[in-house]
Swiss-Prot record:
InterPro entries reported in the protein's UniProt record: Ribosomal_bL12, Ribosomal_bL12_C, Ribosomal_bL12_C/ClpS-like, Ribosomal_bL12_oligo, Ribosomal_bL12_oligo_N_sf
Subunit structure: Homodimer. Part of the ribosomal stalk of the 50S ribosomal subunit. Forms a multimeric L10(L12)X complex, where L10 forms an elongated spine to which 2 to 4 L12 dimers bind in a sequential fashion. Binds GTP-bound translation factors.
Transmembrane stretches, start-end: none
Domain of life of the native organism: Bacteria
Family membership noted in the UniProt record: Belongs to the bacterial ribosomal protein bL12 family.
PANTHER family: 39S RIBOSOMAL PROTEIN L12, LARGE RIBOSOMAL SUBUNIT PROTEIN BL12M
UniProt keyword Ribosomal protein, yes or no: yes
GO molecular function: mRNA binding; structural constituent of ribosome
Upper lineage: Bacteria, Pseudomonadati, Campylobacterota, Epsilonproteobacteria, Campylobacterales
Record's protein name: Large ribosomal subunit protein bL12
């Protein structure tokens, strides 16, 4: 029985955030491509003129170190991401790991605060 596009889409839709991130990295390595968005030339010219005054609106939450209180950090990671226990534990132990991508500044700062209170070291990119 051949695998259809719908089968692939259904499989991907059931992946966790961490598993999906790993899948994207494997695609990038295997096919020599980048998942970075392509910028249109016209937008680049317009963006260059006002780019210095613009404030960054989307952030990635990167866990740099789980700290000494890993259990507390795992609990916060699970609450923030919706990951299962094993995925959250792996994310905390295999640092640096991207917990969330493209979130608002307020959400990123709140997540950073919660993670740091639990004992983690976090970077917003």
């Amino acid at each position: 029985m051949a695998i259809t596009k719908e089968d692939v889409l259904e499989f991907i839709s059931n992946l966790s955030v961490l598993e999906l991130s790993e899948l994207v990295k494997e695609f990038e390595e295997k096919f020599g491509v980048s998942a970075a968005p392509v910028m249109v030339a016209g937008a680049a010219v317009a963006g260059a003129a006002g780019g210095a005054a613009e404030e960054k609106t989307e952030f990635d939450i990167v866990l740099q170190d789980g700290g000494d209180k890993k259990i507390n950090v795992i609990k916060v990671v699970r609450a923030l991401t919706g990951l299962g226990l094993k995925e959250a534990k792996d994310a905390v132990e295999q640092t640096p790991s991207v917990l969330k991508e493209g979130v608002s500044k307020a959400e990123a700062e709140e997540a950073k605060k919660q993670l740091e209170e639990a004992g983690a070291k976090v970077e917003l990119k």
